[in-house]
């Protein structure tokens, strides 16, 4: 309990229905004021204001005291509702609350005053919760009247009571049916009235073991029209009864807890499981009327607590009025600290008693802990991994239920179709989907067009020049074969050496233009090449004539002397390159190289000479590195013609793509074409990755109903990204695992997509995509999916670890185990120890420290070798490994440069180490014949051992 406010008035009260409600109070009739005054006032309090709660915002004197106050909900022309007061003289007066607060004028705010009740006081009144302008009043002589506050016409009576009542103590409207009301009085009965039939329809009474209940108050269930609760103010039977009118012979629950009569009840409108009561025992008690349990009791007052009410719009707050001159406003929850913490532990007795006298020592006592409905979770929901939705709630009987369902996110069809196409390897359907649908942007459309060309024509078809058309069918066939294997590339090299490049054939075909099928049938086999007649000298000639220069005479003489090398040098001196080239045809390779260099040096500014140089060298490094990238297709054709194998082709064509992109960022389509031809998946994917944000922005601009938020656009963009990668991998016949220096950001993006689709329950597709990633990157996600699917999980082994394990397994499978015994192993080990000890005079180190390492056994098929003795070290130190070892070492497996180091990975078990592996028995050499053991060392006495130790130190 937290006390919010305290009003020092002996007054009845009524809450407004504002979010932060106001409190109207009126001096209560039938009680003496604390100041022994007979005056009466009507006041309004802003109880939740930190500055105004101690003083009323409106106060006015009235002629008579009140028995009851009521505050209606707003209705027509009444923005803050009406305040109705029941006076002790039988008068009922109505005030406009809005005018009353603004004008502070009681007479101006009064809208009606009636003395319809004759012969006594009006004890109770209440506004209808459904028809807010309708009021019911009850008073002396059993009079009950229903008022229409819109017209203030003549009020009417609901009918004749079955049992006459002398006084009506409480009237209450049904919260669900507007024409039903209940009344109770001093006759001991509660009557149920139907205004439509204008009669009393039910009559309730109760007699318990201790006597008959004298009903003082009645309240309806907040939502169920057939249930209500009554209170008895009888000293002999102070009970609270819950009723179901469908069986009105006996109450459903009898709640006992008050020691004296109950004067007031209020059933919480927001929570049917909360009911508050107060009575003659000065107690205020909180109940659960559904279960008939007492929840707790609040601090008692000094006199009767004659009225208690929840704040209608703030049910966590309630007010209690008592005859001790106070109205206490407090919370139903107890959040106050214990009394012991409120009073300081002072050693001064006077200070202790002074603090104790002003401290609230009473605190509520709760027997049952129950959260109010506005703090309960009637239903809880949680998303689970794998597109699971867990819902916890209650069924119609109030029992807890647990439901696990699967929900589908927008765009799930794309993921399902992707899985279907991956299974069936129907990548053409993926390409057609993107080409036939609306283009997101030009870059995306261009990418899918290139992939379409790759699927139809292969890599070589990416560089076909429509204007040139110089490639022959045989050349395309050779290029396609070279993409598959190095053996095919070798065959193509032979064709190139034999002159089967097809260019002359195509030119010839263009000249002929006859369309003869026989021409195409023999295309590329040399049958259509132009022939040159064989030169045969004829006629007489002069070796020298009058015009022959000295240099020509010198050259002629050198040729006639068969000094061809000198003749070539002479030609080069005279800059006669043509003659030098002819002479070099039948000369040594050295001479040919000299003439070539002279030619290229002379014509180094010629583009044709540069191309000829690359062709004669059969090396396109210069072409790729320095040729103008504007002619990138011609460069690509040169790479295709002169690359020696598929690895060189991929490397050079990817390098060309790098140059294109570096030269002009806008030429990304040309660069991607080169990357696709070179199988540079990491570079292509990195470009696509950089363009993802723009692709997402373009997606949000489309009219796609599946894309209405950035997160949905992100999912679709990632789906397209993965589709491109999978399609390219399939058409380019690449390996299953991504590799390359740019694999880390690509892997992270694929992992993001895997996380999204696995969260949507697409575990099969997620597993397929995880196969793209290196084991060190995908390991955690694989284990997560395995656990979600209930499959047995196995330790994730990286490729490097797997390679080392394979080498180790192959070694041990080839060791001749029959030749190994523990006896000769120990003998060899001891022999090495004793030999070293004898030669140096040092004490022998333990045998276990010089055993050969696990990886240094002899492998079958290698040259046998003996174990070399380990170098001697100082006493107590482990020997260091020698730089040259006779033991074979396993190749170091490639590791992922982007993977985080794992200190627990056994990646050093094959390194030469003097420390033996704990799981292996003492080792010996398994290659050749073991050397004979040296003579045994005689035992030295203690004196000799001490001298030897001193020398070593």
Swiss-Prot record:
Residues 860-887 have a biased composition (Polar residues). PROSITE patterns: WD_REPEATS_1, WD_REPEATS_2, WD_REPEATS_REGION. The keyword Transferase does not apply. It comes from the Eukaryota. Belongs to the WD repeat SEC31 family. Pfam families: WD40. PANTHER family: SEC31-RELATED PROTEIN, SECRETORY 31, ISOFORM D. Keywords: Cytoplasmic vesicle, Endoplasmic reticulum, ER-Golgi transport, Membrane, Protein transport, Repeat, Transport, WD repeat. Component of the coat protein complex II (COPII) which promotes the formation of transport vesicles from the endoplasmic reticulum (ER). The coat has two main functions, the physical deformation of the endoplasmic reticulum membrane into vesicles and the selection of cargo molecules. Residues 463-472 have a biased composition (Acidic residues). It is a peripheral membrane protein. Residues 473-506, 941-953 have a biased composition (Basic and acidic residues). This is Protein transport protein SEC31. One of its GO terms (cellular component) is endoplasmic reticulum membrane. One of its GO terms (molecular function) is structural molecule activity. The keyword Repeat applies. WD repeats lie at residues 6-46, 61-105, 117-157, 163-203, 210-253, 257-297, 300-340, 382-405. It is found in: Cytoplasmic vesicle, COPII-coated vesicle membrane; Endoplasmic reticulum membrane. GO terms for biological process: COPII-coated vesicle cargo loading; endoplasmic reticulum organization; protein transport. Residues 459-530, 860-953 are annotated as: Disordered. The COPII coat is composed of at least 5 proteins: the SEC23/24 complex, the SEC13/31 complex, and the protein SAR1. SEC13 and SEC31 make a 2:2 tetramer that forms the edge element of the COPII outer coat. The tetramer self-assembles in multiple copies to form the complete polyhedral cage. Interacts (via WD 8) with SEC13.
